[in-house]
Amino acid sequence: MEEYHRHCDEVGFNAEEAHNIVKECVDGVLGGEDYNHNNINQWTASIVEQSLTHLVKLGKAYKYIVTCAVVQKSAYGFHTASSCFWDTTSDGTCTVRWENRTMNCIVNVFAIAIVL
């Protein structure tokens, strides 16, 4: 039996397209807001859900993982890292960094190609 492999439009993950989608979602949720601990759960849930919805609507053969962290600005800063073991020709990631005067937001998108 011959196997058929579809590799996400044969060009790999479009990180710029994903970055633009996520940035719009973050701007829509956090734009104009000041840090408020009581709103963090709602904000982060909205950002990941909206981002995921828009990414899936692209209709590409990927499974997506979206993470979001929002932290209050302070003198201590904010550092994060991630690592993946995957097929770099078809899978990909993008990170969106967003900030205003009161908070920082980091959103990571991991896209894993679905091979059929």
UniProtKB/Swiss-Prot annotation:
Domain of life where this protein originates: Eukaryota
Gene Ontology biological process terms in this record: cell division; microtubule-based movement; positive regulation of mitotic cell cycle; regulation of mitotic cell cycle
Gene Ontology MF annotations: dynein intermediate chain binding; identical protein binding
Pfam family, one: Tctex-1
Localisation: Nucleus; Cytoplasm, Cytoskeleton; Chromosome, Centromere, Kinetochore
One GO term describing the cellular component: kinetochore
InterPro entries in the record: Tctex-1-like (IPR005334), Tctex-1-like_sf (IPR038586)
3'-nitrotyrosine carried by residues: Y4
Alphabetically ordered keywords of this record: Cell cycle, Cell division, Centromere, Chromosome, Cytoplasm, Cytoskeleton, Dynein, Kinetochore, Microtubule, Mitosis, Motor protein, Nitration, Nucleus, Transport
Quaternary structure, from the entry: Homodimer. The cytoplasmic dynein 1 complex consists of two catalytic heavy chains (HCs) and a number of non-catalytic subunits presented by intermediate chains (ICs), light intermediate chains (LICs) and light chains (LCs); the composition seems to vary in respect to the IC, LIC and LC composition. The heavy chain homodimer serves as a scaffold for the probable homodimeric assembly of the respective non-catalytic subunits. The ICs and LICs bind directly to the HC dimer and the LCs assemble on the IC dimer. DYNLT1 and DYNLT3 compete for association with dynein IC (DYNC1I1 or DYNC1I2).
Function comment: Acts as one of several non-catalytic accessory components of the cytoplasmic dynein 1 complex that are thought to be involved in linking dynein to cargos and to adapter proteins that regulate dynein function. Cytoplasmic dynein 1 acts as a motor for the intracellular retrograde motility of vesicles and organelles along microtubules. Probably binds BUB3 as part of transport cargo. Required for the efficient progression through mitosis.
Family statement drawn from the similarity comment of this UniProt entry: Belongs to the dynein light chain Tctex-type family.
Name of the protein this chain belongs to: Dynein light chain Tctex-type 3
Gene name for this UniProt entry: DYNLT3
